[in-house]
Amino acid sequence: MDLTPREKDKMLIFTAGLVAERRLARGVKLNYPEAMAYISAALLEGARDGQTVADLMHYGTTLLTRDQVMEGIPEMIPEIQVEATFPDGTKLVTVHQPIA
């Protein structure tokens, strides 16, 4: 399989997002990279499904709560920016205060 660097990045985010999803299902609190991957993967999938940028900006704030991440993680992630592929092209999705 010959992937571009961008495709490799997406695969890495998706794989790390799956690990984070499984840990959440077991009740394990997520660390910084896991929380970033979990939210980023969900945003990428939402874009692929055809959701709008505005919908994803709101959706990104509903994915994780403070109780699901380690102490101090919400403060470490004031925003997340993901370059996602939508049906009409690539757009930047910014989620402010993603962990409520």
UniProtKB/Swiss-Prot annotation:
Does the keyword Zinc feature in the UniProt annotation? Answer: no
Source organism (scientific name): Pseudomonas syringae pv. tomato (strain ATCC BAA-871 / DC3000)
Q: What is this protein called?
A: Urease subunit gamma
Q: How does it assemble?
A: Heterotrimer of UreA (gamma), UreB (beta) and UreC (alpha) subunits. Three heterotrimers associate to form the active enzyme.
**Which InterPro entries does the protein's record reference?**
Urease_gamma (IPR012010), Urease_gamma/gamma-beta_su (IPR002026), Urease_gamma_sf (IPR036463), Urease_subunit (IPR050069)
Which keywords accompany this UniProt record? Cytoplasm, Hydrolase
Q: Which HAMAP family match?
A: Urease_gamma
Give the UniProt family note.
Belongs to the urease gamma subunit family.
Name the Gene Ontology biological process terms: urea catabolic process
Q: What class of enzyme is it?
A: hydrolase
List the catalytic activities from the record. urea + 2 H2O + H(+) = hydrogencarbonate + 2 NH4(+)
EC number, UniProt record: 3.5.1.5
Q: Which GO terms describe its molecular function?
A: nickel cation binding; urease activity
One matching Pfam family: Urease_gamma
Q: Does the keyword Hydrolase apply?
A: yes
| Known pathway | Nitrogen metabolism; urea degradation; CO(2) and NH(3) from urea (urease route): step 1/1
Q: What GO CC terms are in its UniProt record? A: cytoplasm
Cell compartment(s), UniProt: Cytoplasm
